[in-house]
Amino acid sequence: MSSSSYRDSYFQYRHLPAPHHILYAEWNQDILALPDEVANITMAMKDNTRTDAEEGRAPQDGERNSNVRESAQGKALMTSEQNSNRYWNSFHDEDDWNLFNGMELESNGVVTFAGQAFDHSLNGGTNSRNDGANEPRKETITGSIFDRRITQLAYARNNGWHELALPQSR
């Protein structure tokens, strides 16, 4: 047994006692493809398969993915259509930007949503207290990303910070 494997096992014993801790440690080292790249690859593969089926022949391995190439990173795939935003068109851009702009996700699954605080008064106006240079203070929501109550609270606060905009689950 080499000394490096002893150190690795000791580190895992002391610092990564649960299986999901090891998973989070591996996530920190992953390089993931952007959603646009994944969508473009899927579309390119469907187009190649459809063209081959129309011609009535089976595709050869070398020509099936001729318009899809691997990037230098090795994990992300690229296509000739680099500036497509089809993936993002299905989102409400302003709401999603407000929700995810201040979000921080740590490797242990703790998420922090930072948002602009609003006064919960009847008039629904912005925070009217004297906060220095009339800037609204920031509120944060912190908790486990796997706890649905945390994400629901962040979503509700994102949509006005004073009204619940989520549909009731039944």
Swiss-Prot record:
Residues 48-81, 122-141 are annotated as: Disordered. Pathway: Protein modification; protein ubiquitination. One of its GO terms (biological process) is anaphase-promoting complex-dependent catabolic process. Keywords: Cell cycle, Cell division, Meiosis, Mitosis, Ubl conjugation pathway. Residues 48-67, 132-141 have a biased composition (Basic and acidic residues). The APC/C is composed of at least 13 subunits that stay tightly associated throughout the cell cycle: APC1, APC2, APC4, APC5, APC9, APC11, CDC16, CDC23, CDC26, CDC27, DOC1, MND2 and SWM1. SWM1 interacts directly with CDC23 and APC5, and is required to tether APC9, CDC16, CDC26 and CDC27 to the complex. Component of the anaphase promoting complex/cyclosome (APC/C), a cell cycle-regulated E3 ubiquitin-protein ligase complex that controls progression through mitosis and the G1 phase of the cell cycle. The APC/C is thought to confer substrate specificity and, in the presence of ubiquitin-conjugating E2 enzymes, it catalyzes the formation of protein-ubiquitin conjugates that are subsequently degraded by the 26S proteasome. Belongs to the APC13 family. This is Anaphase-promoting complex subunit SWM1. It comes from Saccharomyces cerevisiae (strain ATCC 204508 / S288c) (Baker's yeast). The gene is SWM1.
